[in-house]
Swiss-Prot record:
Its main location: virion. This is Serine/threonine-protein kinase UL13 homolog. Signal peptide: none annotated. The keyword Membrane does not apply. Multifunctional serine/threonine kinase that plays a role in several processes including egress of virus particles from the nucleus, modulation of the actin cytoskeleton and regulation of viral and cellular gene expression. Regulates the nuclear localization of viral envelopment factor proteins 24 and 27, by phosphorylating the protein kinase ORF66, indicating a role in nuclear egress. Disrupts host nuclear lamins, including LMNA and LMNB1. Phosphorylates the viral Fc receptor composed of glycoproteins E (gE) and I (gI). Residues 1-63 are annotated as: Disordered. Gene3D superfamilies: Transferase(Phosphotransferase) domain 1. Belongs to the protein kinase superfamily. Ser/Thr protein kinase family. It is an enzyme of class 2 (transferase). The keyword Kinase applies. GO terms for cellular component: host cell nucleus; viral tegument. It comes from Varicella-zoster virus (strain Dumas). It catalyses: L-seryl-[protein] + ATP = O-phospho-L-seryl-[protein] + ADP + H(+); L-threonyl-[protein] + ATP = O-phospho-L-threonyl-[protein] + ADP + H(+).
Amino acid sequence: MDADDTPPNLQISPTAGPLRSHHNTDGHEPNATAADQQERESTNPTHGCVNHPWANPSTATCMESPERSQQTSLFLLKHGLTRDPIHQRERVDVFPQFNKPPWVFRISKLSRLIVPIFTLNEQLCFSKLQIRDRPRFAGRGTYGRVHIYPSSKIAVKTMDSRVFNRELINAILASEGSIRAGERLGISSIVCLLGFSLQTKQLLFPAYDMDMDEYIVRLSRRLTIPDHIDRKIAHVFLDLAQALTFLNRTCGLTHLDVKCGNIFLNVDNFASLEITTAVIGDYSLVTLNTYSLCTRAIFEVGNPSHPEHVLRVPRDASQMSFRLVLSHGTNQPPEILLDYINGTGLTKYTGTLPQRVGLAIDLYALGQALLEVILLGRLPGQLPISVHRTPHYHYYGHKLSPDLALDTLAYRCVLAPYILPSDIPGDLNYNPFIHAGELNTRISRNSLRRIFQCHAVRYGVTHSKLFEGIRIPASLYPATVVTSLLCHDNSEIRSDHPLLWHDRDWIGST
């Protein structure tokens, strides 16, 4: 490839978020009804667009020029890409492109003021993918499988038709957010969709060198780690925190599946393991929170006047399921686990997920991922056995139960003083972690309090000697500070503490 033709050096995780059975596509309608079509045709196509968050009046058309279309076709034919046309037209057909698109969707019109109708970027839609590159099978989930095309540096996720539309819409919304985050704030930590096929039920994403799980394994095998690698890890997770905050607050999207397996990385080289790119991906569980303006959105594929396909955001996309929130129970913040234990709060909530709750969940899970990097990637060499961030699932049959929730909270209380710093830069009154006695007062039933106390005492007896052997290198101090902030008991500190957003001089140069 020529230098200008090289697509970004990117990978999707082979195990990133297996497709879940909870997805429901009943809200999708493959084609608009006659009444809907008549209403859209009678609606002023520019009315209300300027004030809509996705509106871009300077780029009102989705059709590219014949010259640009021909250039795109020649570029992709050069690299062995072909596809059948979505519909017949006189100009040269358009082929999928593997660089990040300049836009994913644009406002077309508004229907009844609360139903935005968007036009999807036609360049993202293809009928069939043909690449002169031998794919590598990367993994299989419940409803799909992933293949990596190493030379083209793309990952193709082929999905079951029952969940395809839901994840496609999630990816469309998050990808437009990825582009906006880069343009407005320089945030580049959100995976962007490169293409999709309605016919073959495929999603195209960039391919990355590895996910964070693999990075932890590689890091744990290193005998020595340069200080700048540790500081880089702190920078990377601050970038990811900003990306999740942008998704939640600006796009109205809560990820709900933040974990090491869904954080994808590029490294400078496999010898140094210095991270050059880190992004959050896998939109299987994304939920629209109370800040979303797209809960009733319609996406049209093809010519806006005569769309080939119509995608509708399903009604349950913005309905919070507490069972879904708890799907990764050991990643959840204390307030969510306490709601589950006490049967209060979100357990009785049936509306749209509050934005502040969604952000608190995502950031806490991100902090747990960073804690995993520290414990399993950086400390194994100094301890006789590995220290994990949670109790092992196999004791509980890999299912969340009130006893596992109590066990998890007790384990965190005992582990935290050995890992998290007692103070942080510029905050003399900072309390880095919650103690078992304080947490015990927030458990409503006496019987459950006794269980929690038993777990805490047990871990103090069985694990204190192991934890006392932990020595945090000075170069890891910034990473432990970030962990402390993201995993703080106070959800407001998680999202708004100045160290997360202000100058990062306190970390030191990388």
